[in-house]
A protein has these predicted regions:
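Minor-groove-contacting beta-hairpin "wing" of winged helix-turn-helix DNA-binding domains
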Residues: 54-62
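Key DNA-contact positions within bacterial/archaeal DNA-binding proteins
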Residues: 39
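C-terminal flanking helix
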Residues: 49-50
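Extreme N-terminal segment that seeds HTH/winged-HTH DNA-binding domains in transcriptional regulators
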Residues: 1-32
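Short, hydrophobic-biased segments on the C-terminal half of alpha helices
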Residues: 45-46
Length: 62
C-alpha cells in the first residue's frame, strides 16, 4: 500500500500536477491524485497562494 503524502509533499505534487496539465484540474481530481478530499485540496491551494504561487480558480478547476 502506498504511503500517504505529508502536507508539504502533497502541495508539491499539486503544483507539479497543475504545471503539467494543459487543462484545468478540479479539486476532486487533485484530491484523487493526492489521496485526500476536495476540501483538503482547497485548503492546500490557499496555503500555496500564501506562499506566493499564483493559482487561478475557474468553474472548470485550477
Amino acid at each position: 500500500m502506498e504511503q500517504a503524502l505529508n502536507g508539504s509533499q502533497r502541495r508539491k505534487k499539486i503544483v507539479m500536477l497543475l504545471k503539467q496539465s494543459p487543462n484545468p484540474l478540479s479539486g476532486a481530481a487533485l484530491g484523487k491524485e493526492t489521496g485526500v478530499s476536495r476540501q483538503v485540496v482547497v485548503q492546500d491551494i490557499a496555503l500555496l497562494r500564501t506562499e506566493g504561487y499564483e493559482i487561478s480558480a475557474t468553474p472548470r478547476g485550477y
